[in-house]
Amino acid sequence: RVNTSADILATWQNNLQDLCEKQALAIPALVASNPRNHVVSSAAQGLSLGAGKFTAWPGELGLAAARDEAMVYQFADYSRQEWLSIGLRKGYMYMADLATEPRWMRIEGTFGESAELAASVMKQIVLGFQGPKLNPSSIALTTKHFPGGGAVENGHDPHFEWGKRELFEGGKFENNLI
């Protein structure tokens, strides 16, 4: 979770893989990251990874607001190439949650409240990072937080005990399954 330059990350990755290759089973390490390719206002330690170090694209809400599938795919494909160049092979991203609770503190990490738009953006991101089929130049993704992390009671974060209750007002649970 450090916000360091791409060349330092690549050197670190190469050294790690060299160490793994020297072990009896020579099993490579898989290093994962949160998103690294967005414009952010603050490059806080452990957050906003890659700020100022990787190509900067709009954040999640900005990508969705553009309503341009080709541009979202291009973002993901270019980002994939940068990740591959330094040895990152897995991303803990993106949030498929719908922004249905306005008090939730993580709305900026979603693609908004429209299930159809969020699904369209997620599809292009998966295709851009992974391809239509996993292959040697794919970046594996873990989409989070299924289902409906954005529908938490009182806007609390579901990572904590007090945010474990999700409310789907008006029977909107099905909307999270698009």
Which residues fall in each region the model found?
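Glycoside hydrolase catalytic-domain context in secreted enzymes
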Residues: 1-178
